[in-house]
Amino acid sequence: MIFQYARYICTLLIFCCSSIVFSQDSFIRGKLLDVQTGEPIVFATIRVKDRAKGVISNQDGSFRIPTRFKELGDMLVISSMGYQKKEIPITGLSPEYINIIRLAPGILDLSEAVVTAQKKRKLSARRIVRKAIANIKRNYPLNTFSTIGYYRDYQLKQGNYVNLNEAVLEVFDQGFSRIDSATTKVRIYDYKRNTDFEQDTLADDPYDYKRLLKIVDNAYLDSYGGNEFSILRVHDAVRNYKVGSYSFVDQLDTDLLKNHSFSRDNDTYLNGEALYTIKFRKRHPHYSAFGILYISYGDFAVHKMEYTLYDDRKRLPDRKLNKHQGRGQLIFEITTEYQRHDYGKMFLNYISFENSFILWEPPKFKVENSTIGLMKSPSGGIGGFRLELTFNRHPNTDEARDVGNYLVRYKGKRLKIKTAGLVKNEKKVFLLPDMTQKERKEILEGIFEAMKKKINLNNLFSIEIEPIFDLEGKNRLHEWKKRDYDQFREYFVQQVKPSTKLPNDGKFMDKNKPIFEGQAMVRPEDFEEYWMNTPLK
């Protein structure tokens, strides 16, 4: 006879060697640091010279290159916004240690562009952005091309990588004149769940707004069936400039200028090309949004776009400030960088999408079932009853025996409890009601009648339990625990094929299904030319 209880309470380069040694020598590992500050250089491009292949540095500035390029005597070309471009012989890098490479911030040399700069100095920030939007069709490919790159998604929990999933993908894009989500195809070369890092099955589930178990607070993020790469693609506002992308950029060609205020900042350069730096922001009663655009002096091509949105209704703890000197908590941050190809067109170099999310962890301590135990009288008949609660863990002894922690009702009327005790060697508590003989008889008759008519005993009894702890004192009864995570999805291009054809066979990724669950995988003959830039553990 089981009934449920009814309550939830709820460039200068310097090579140094670190002390870390790796036994695996299939990759040369490096880390990029700012020579002045010692801070990691994030999302720098590391290319193998004349091979059009490379990687992008990780959040900690780390990267890895297959040792075969060292055997071939190749050079690495390192470039990053605002730093001097540098070439490094791979033969000078250690295969055993993390190679620390320090880069010096670049100095913008306007000697060759001074005339152009003087002519364009009077351009307002808003006018520069307007020209950049108008020139998208001219600056980006309109015909089919593909990129091959390293994709990963993961979460950060207290600064540590969790649920790291990695893949090598080829993305067949039919050009900026076509709708990306409807026409782009993706072929998976390889994918894996990296079990060298912590796995958290709850955090790895798709977003769940129906049960509110995993959500972006005060925002909505379509789960796309759990396909994180599909989520990433739709958040490239430049590629999707004619459709909605994310608040408050929305549809870039019609809404970016309308929704934001703009200002010019100090110009910079990348690979010798002078770039305007345009800052913009959105003011809203509940949100703050900040963005930066890096736009070419010459053809107004967008080289890079950064966008960060904060929820000003949720404050950072301990009076901390976010990187824009506000107190709002991060909702999402997106960074997209395009690079100019030899043909003059701009192709994706990388895209990174970070969002915070809330995960509600189910209670670890709960009541599994409630039963009624019939008690014999000295004469052998039924002389009484007791209520029995079975827990999934041993409850705290003192709290379990405190009758004040239980509120029992029979047919809506409170039933006083005389004694609460523990059943020996079981995770069970019994409750003895304090009743008159008349009340006992009436309730027993009600129980027998319900059994006879197969009536659910929930219609007779309800039990509310205060949030007692388990025996270890770590888990409160039926308490859902809120956990805050940062989710990342990132795609780093290793090779661009500026002119290609869509393969005839249909072995493409299902965009509405998780990448890492039974997707078709195709490995080309040159598969070994590509690799996963796994973060340092």
Q: Each predicted region: which residue ranges?
A:
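Short, acidic Ser/Thr/Gly-rich low-complexity loop/linker segments typical of extracellular
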Residues: A52-S62
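A short, amphipathic beta-strand motif
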Residues: I28-D34, G61-F63, I101
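Short Pro-Gly-centered beta-turn/loop motif in secreted/extracellular proteins
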Residues: G38-V42, R64-G73
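Extended beta-strand-rich segments in extracellular/periplasmic secretory proteins, especially
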Residues: N135, R239-S296, A301-T308
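A short, solvent-exposed loop/turn motif at the edges and junctions
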Residues: V48-D50, M75-I88
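Surface-exposed, low-complexity/disordered segments
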Residues: E87, S94-H260, Y269-N271, N322-K537
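Beta-strand-rich domain onsets/edges
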Residues: S19-F27, A104
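Structural motif
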Residues: Q24, K31-I41
